[in-house]
A protein has these predicted regions:
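Structural signature of nuclease core domains in nucleic-acid processing machines
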Residues: 1-196
Length: 196
């Protein structure tokens, strides 16, 4: 059984405020940022512990912990069930996908990697994989296509929305050793891979 102390913590909003800088989610995305933060913490943990240790039943048994983490991240009580289900579905879908399994299994991957650029900006990269020809930088996303989306329209919208962010990540990783970096967005719930 999973215990809350075994997992990465998600800092409550009031702790950031006590340090003098309140952490605010972008309202336009609702609870999406909190869901993403909690899902990323779980994916990092599963990747480090090994996906064989995480059957779907263990994830299902961890929903109460997810709700606690989401609540601490600012999700309202009224939205906790929906938000926790989004995290659960993201994790289960990642484990069910061959691409998701590969991303969790890849040896020597840097997970939730904090990098500082020349301007002092910190970026937390979900996953960076050193390959023979350079780097692969992957940003997990918890969203799903709209009902009327085609794969191409969804990919184009996501490139528009997240492209600058993933390119910044690639630049930061490439600056470490001069090797090229390519970026991708991975949407486990829809099993969609978007090259950026």
């Amino acid at each position: 059984r999973v215990h809350e102390n075994d997992l990465p913590s998600v800092e409550p909003q009031h702790n950031a405020a006590q340090r003098g800088a309140a952490w605010q989610w972008h309202e336009e995305f609702g609870d999406e940022a909190a869901i993403g933060t909690v899902a990323h913490a779980w994916l990092e943990h599963i990747g480090k512990e090994g996906l064989e240790q995480w059957p779907a039943q263990r994830i299902d048994a961890s929903v109460a912990i997810m709700k606690t983490q989401l609540g601490r991240a600012g999700v309202s009580r009224a939205e906790l069930d929906t938000a926790a289900d989004a995290v659960r579905l993201t994790l289960v879908a990642t484990l069910a996908s061959s691409r998701g399994q590969w991303l969790l299994r890849v040896a020597g991957a840097y997970r939730e990697w904090s990098l500082l650029d020349a301007t002092g900006r910190v970026s937390v990269i979900d996953l960076a994989i050193s390959e023979e020809k350079g780097w692969l930088v992957v940003d997990y996303k918890t969203g799903v296509p709209w009902p009327d989306d085609t794969p191409d329209t969804f990919a184009a919208r996501m490139r528009e929305r997240h492209g600058a962010q993933i390119q910044r990540y690639c630049s930061q990783v490439s600056a470490l050793d001069g090797r090229p970096a390519r970026g991708a967005l991975y949407f486990p719930r829809a099993d969609i891979w978007v090259e950026c």
